């Protein structure tokens, strides 16, 4: 709750700037904390008070759920865009008539997908114009103040980040392929290839760069990019496949250019009858082109088996006829080529003497080295996180084995220790619940304890009649306890340190009444039962002694047991805070469900019955 004094300090402090603006209600003032304030609004506000400020224009909290969800959606859109853009390199296709054509159907499909992806970049710019930012001068302490003034947000964004987002959002391929290139002179195929080579790559770089700050924002908000380790490993593998996808597309386009370069070399030899425009499929039916093609030896000279021209690393594309194949066939072949050479660091590439080809091979080797190292490192980190607790348990088990060997424990004790460790691992999977709960706020810790323990505590008939506050106090102090088969929870005559509420498993409870000759009483207890009730009797004593009571029974687990334990100090605290535990009705209920009181009652009934029998015999 924001107090009037806080509002006064907030309006008068140096950290607050005021700007004149009409209220959302249309009058000359705004309501803040149920008070009518002057017609000025906050331009900066603490993050905790952000939701209390109502504005006419929607300003998003950079730490809020809306921005967090949008960042995830935009990250997916960016990855789709990075996948779609290299597909434009597959538009040129080599025809049997020794010419290059453009796949119209693929072109239309890619432009539609690219246009949809561009919409997300435009929305991202809109979101950036309406997202508050933390004032740099307020980062000294706490989470800082949010600047919510629209003009300041716009000014900051225009000077920082807008140009990059604007370049990434431009629909350059659509405009150039559909509008600019058809109106240019010269070969349409040559112009299209130049656009694909330069414009796509130039715009691809800022789009690729946007991935890194976007991932950083998601990590700052949640600590991770993905929620699970397997999703994180798949995310890094997908980035590696994306690099293979880009390299394969570049290799395909360069293969077509190398094949066209071979044709042009032959054309120079046949200069009298050949023109470079002949390699555009729009010129296939031209009479000069037809006569040249009939007499030309271009098909034989530019064959992969010919020694006329060195295709270098692009020889596979010509030999396998990738450049003339259908879209999906050439795409998957190029993807495999990129993945294979990226993983092998380009060791299988046999280059020619062309400088551009050698530089491309160097890029493949360098990029493969960096990306492969990052992939292995990130994959190892993500996958190890799924087995880190298992590895910790193995290390701890090794330490335990070494300690038992050093202390020369007998085999039966060693087996008991191993059995307990294994059962504890199966039950908890290495998670220390108490340690996790201690790091949470008190209110949240109480709610979790209530969720985990309330129904289990209510199974105990003794606690069924208690009110909610008393049950919450008990649940808050319950601690999980595990016992393996043949474990003695308590022995007759030993001090009772804790009261146990059985959740799962069965136990034997028996007594000899202090070792009295011929006396033996036993019973079976299971889920919903409890033991150690002597401790509750001690805690309910108005003047309890410092000496913890001794157990009147021996309790032994006959199967694996899960229980909640309430230690003596906690039980004493609950009994002192809630006087209802001292009620006569609750005491009677305790005695009714207590095995100790049942045994005493049975003994008294037996004594009374024997006395009655003896009196009857004496009277006869």
Swiss-Prot record:
Q: In which tissues is it expressed?
A: Expressed in roots, stems, leaves, flowers and pods.
Residues crossing the lipid bilayer are 73-93, 102-122, 161-181, 198-218, 237-257, 356-376
Return the GO cellular component terms, semicolon-separated. Answer: nuclear membrane
How this chain sits in the membrane, per its record, is: Multi-pass membrane protein
User: Which keywords fit this entry according to its UniProt record?
Assistant: Ion channel, Ion transport, Ligand-gated ion channel, Membrane, Nucleus, Transmembrane, Transmembrane helix, Transport
SUPFAM superfamilies linked to this entry: cAMP-binding domain-like (SSF51206), Voltage-gated potassium channels (SSF81324)
Q: Which GO terms describe its molecular function?
A: calcium channel activity; transmembrane transporter binding; voltage-gated potassium channel activity
Q: Please give the superkingdom of this protein's source.
A: Eukaryota
Q: Which residues bind a nucleoside 3',5'-cyclic phosphate?
A: 462-559
Q: Which PANTHER family match?
A: CYCLIC NUCLEOTIDE-GATED ION CHANNEL 15-RELATED, CYCLIC NUCLEOTIDE-GATED ION CHANNEL 15-RELATED-RELATED
Assembly: Interacts (via N-terminus) with DMI1 (via c-terminus). The Nod factor has no effect on this interaction, implying that the complex is maintained after activation.
As for what it does, the entry says: Cyclic nucleotide-gated channel involved in the establishment of both rhizobial and mycorrhizal associations. Required for full activation of nuclear-localized Ca(2+) oscillations by Nod and Myc factors. Simultaneous activation of the K(+)-permeable channel DMI1 and the Ca(2+) channel CNGC15 can give rise to sustained Ca(2+) oscillations. May function during fertilization in both female and male gametophytic Ca(2+) signaling.
Q: Belongs to which family?
A: Belongs to the cyclic nucleotide-gated cation channel (TC 1.A.1.5) family.
Entry protein name: Protein CNGC15b
Taxonomic classification: Eukaryota, Viridiplantae, Streptophyta, Embryophyta, Tracheophyta
């Amino acid at each position: 709750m924001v107090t009037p004094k806080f509002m006064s300090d907030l309006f008068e402090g140096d950290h607050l700037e005021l700007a004149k603006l009409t209220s959302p209600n249309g009058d000359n003032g705004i309501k803040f904390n149920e008070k009518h304030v002057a017609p000025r609004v906050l331009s900066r506000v603490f993050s905790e008070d952000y939701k209390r400020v109502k504005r006419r224009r929607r300003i998003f909290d950079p730490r809020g759920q809306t921005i967090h969800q949008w960042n995830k959606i935009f990250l997916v859109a960016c990855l789709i865009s990075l996948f779609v853009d290299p597909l434009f390199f597959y538009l040129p296709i080599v025809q049997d008539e020794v010419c290059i054509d453009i796949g119209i159907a693929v072109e239309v499909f890619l432009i539609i997908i690219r246009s949809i992806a561009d919409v997300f970049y435009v929305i991202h710019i809109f979101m950036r114009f309406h997202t508050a930012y933390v004032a740099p001068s307020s980062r000294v302490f706490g989470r800082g103040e949010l600047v919510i003034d629209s003009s300041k947000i716009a000014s900051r964004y225009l000077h920082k980040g807008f140009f990059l987002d604007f370049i990434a959002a431009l629909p350059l391929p659509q405009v150039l392929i559909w509008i600019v290139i058809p109106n240019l002179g010269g070969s349409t195929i040559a112009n299209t290839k130049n656009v694909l080579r330069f414009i796509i790559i130039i715009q691809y770089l800022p789009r690729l760069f946007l991935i890194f700050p976007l991932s950083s924002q998601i990590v700052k908000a949640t600590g991770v990019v993905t929620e699970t380790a397997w999703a994180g490993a798949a995310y890094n593998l997908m980035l590696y496949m994306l690099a293979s996808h880009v390299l394969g597309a570049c290799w395909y386009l360069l293969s077509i250019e190398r094949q066209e370069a071979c044709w042009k070399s032959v054309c120079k030899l046949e200069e009298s009858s050949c023109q470079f425009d002949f390699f555009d499929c729009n010129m296939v039916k031209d009479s000069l082109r037809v006569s040249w093609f009939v007499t030309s030896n271009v098909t034989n000279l530019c064959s992969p088996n010919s020694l006329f021209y060195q295709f270098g690393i692009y020889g596979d594309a010509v030999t396998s006829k990738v450049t003339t194949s259908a879209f999906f066939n050439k795409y998957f072949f190029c993807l495999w080529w990129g993945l294979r050479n990226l993983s092998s660091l380009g060791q299988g590439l046999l280059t020619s003497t062309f400088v551009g080809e050698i530089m491309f091979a160097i890029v493949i080797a360098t990029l493969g080295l960096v990306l492969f190292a990052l992939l292995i490192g990130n994959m190892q980190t993500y996958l190890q996180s799924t087995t880190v607790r298992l590895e910790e348990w193995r290390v701890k088990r090794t330490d335990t084995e070494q300690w038992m060997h050093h202390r020369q424990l007998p085999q039966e004790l060693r087996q008991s220790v191993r059995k307990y460790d294994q059962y504890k691992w199966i039950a908890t999977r290495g998670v220390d619940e108490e340690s996790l709960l201690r790091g949470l706020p008190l209110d949240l810790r109480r709610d979790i304890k209530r969720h985990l323990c309330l129904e289990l505590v209510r199974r105990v008939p003794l606690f069924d009649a208690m009110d909610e506050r008393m049950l919450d106090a008990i649940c808050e102090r319950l601690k999980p306890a595990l016992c393996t088969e043949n474990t003695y929870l308590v022995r007759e005559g030993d001090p009772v340190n804790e009261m146990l509420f059985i959740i799962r498993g069965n136990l034997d409870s028996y007594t000899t009444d202090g070792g009295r000759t011929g006396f033996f009483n036993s019973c079976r207890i299971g889920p919903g039962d409890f033991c150690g009730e002597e401790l509750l009797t001690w805690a309910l004593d108005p003047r309890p002694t410092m000496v913890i009571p001794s157990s009147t029974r021996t309790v032994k687990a006959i199967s694996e047991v899960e229980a909640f334990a309430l230690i003596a100090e906690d039980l004493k605290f609950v009994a002192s805070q809630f006087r209802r535990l001292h009620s006569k009705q609750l005491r009677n209920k305790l005695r009714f469900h207590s095995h100790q009181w049942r045994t005493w009652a049975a003994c008294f009934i037996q004594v009374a019955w024997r006395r009655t029998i003896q009196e009857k015999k004496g009277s006869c």
